[in-house]
């Protein structure tokens, strides 16, 4: 930002995102199918039919509630932790390094979560992830605030940051099949974005009213406990078979 400013940073980000587009060609379905191949799959369900099935499947909504918690926590911390650090006498660079550590270790955490999800119960792994988030936040607030505790918190939160995504999408795929994954994971992700809105908005509102983030930290911890609880009722039972 000091070198090229906000507009330049956005331009660089746009260029990097554009470079991803050619990778979409690697995901193309085969253009031709052997005419002698006999399909044994079930007839595709309609959009409304799938929505009705999902609407009546309680574990799907428990999963969505858990993803709401994910959105609330990551956006609250991502937006407001740098301000929290400034309030406690640290400079802006400290917050920047914290976010960089989150981004770096998020790569490791997300990949590892996906690998573990192929070997162990995904709902149980999500219970562990949300529980560890709550413990990490409690430790961060209780321990004396220093550069080392800040950076350690950044590493831990990075490992837990979006590690929920492959597990959550994997559960949706197991429930309803990959044919309907994009639609139904989009609905679950919508709840994540609703949580993101409230995490960002309530954090700012609380700070404006009280001058601190104490209440939202408590809410984040309580939401971790809530997420652990709701995932107790999430299973990977096949609702729709491909």
Language-model features: locations:
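Extracytoplasmic gate region of multi-pass secondary transporters
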Residues: 55-113, 199
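Flexible cytoplasmic inter-helical loops of multi-pass small-molecule transporters
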Residues: 28-49, 240-242
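A late C-terminal transmembrane helix in Major Facilitator Superfamily
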Residues: 162, 175-210, 220
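MFS 12-TM fold signature
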Residues: 16-20, 132-137, 157, 223-227
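Multi-pass alpha-helical transporter architecture, strongest
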Residues: 20-28, 221-242
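Helix-loop-helix hairpin linking two adjacent transmembrane segments in secondary transporters
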Residues: 1-32
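C-terminal transmembrane helical hairpin of 12-TM major facilitator-type secondary transporters
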Residues: 102-105, 112, 119-171
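Interfacial helix-cap and linker-helix signal at transmembrane-aqueous boundaries
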Residues: 1-5, 85-86, 116-117, 202-211
């Amino acid at each position: 930002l000091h070198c090229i400013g906000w507009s330049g940073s956005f331009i660089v980000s746009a260029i990097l995102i554009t470079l991803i587009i050619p990778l979409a060609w690697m995901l193309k379905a085969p253009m031709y199918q052997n005419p002698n191949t006999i399909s044994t799959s079930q007839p595709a369900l309609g959009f409304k039919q799938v929505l009705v099935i999902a609407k009546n499947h309680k574990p799907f909504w428990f999963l969505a509630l858990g993803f709401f918690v994910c959105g609330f926590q990551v956006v609250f911390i991502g937006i407001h932790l740098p301000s929290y650090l400034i309030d406690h006498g640290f400079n802006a660079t400290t917050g920047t390094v914290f976010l960089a550590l989150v981004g770096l270790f998020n790569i490791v955490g997300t990949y590892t979560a996906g690998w573990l999800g192929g070997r162990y119960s995904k709902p149980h792994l999500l219970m562990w992830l949300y529980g560890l988030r709550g413990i990490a936040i409690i430790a961060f607030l209780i321990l004396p605030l220093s550069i080392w505790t800040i950076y350690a918190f950044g590493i831990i939160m990075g490992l837990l940051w979006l590690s929920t995504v492959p597990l959550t999408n994997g559960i949706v795929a197991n429930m309803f099949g990959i044919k309907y994954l994009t639609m139904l994971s989009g609905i679950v992700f919508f709840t994540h974005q609703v949580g993101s809105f409230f995490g960002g908005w309530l954090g700012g509102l609380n700070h404006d009213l009280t001058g601190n983030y104490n209440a939202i930290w408590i809410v984040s911890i309580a939401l971790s406990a809530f997420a652990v609880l709701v995932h107790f009722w999430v299973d990977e039972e096949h609702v729709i078979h491909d």
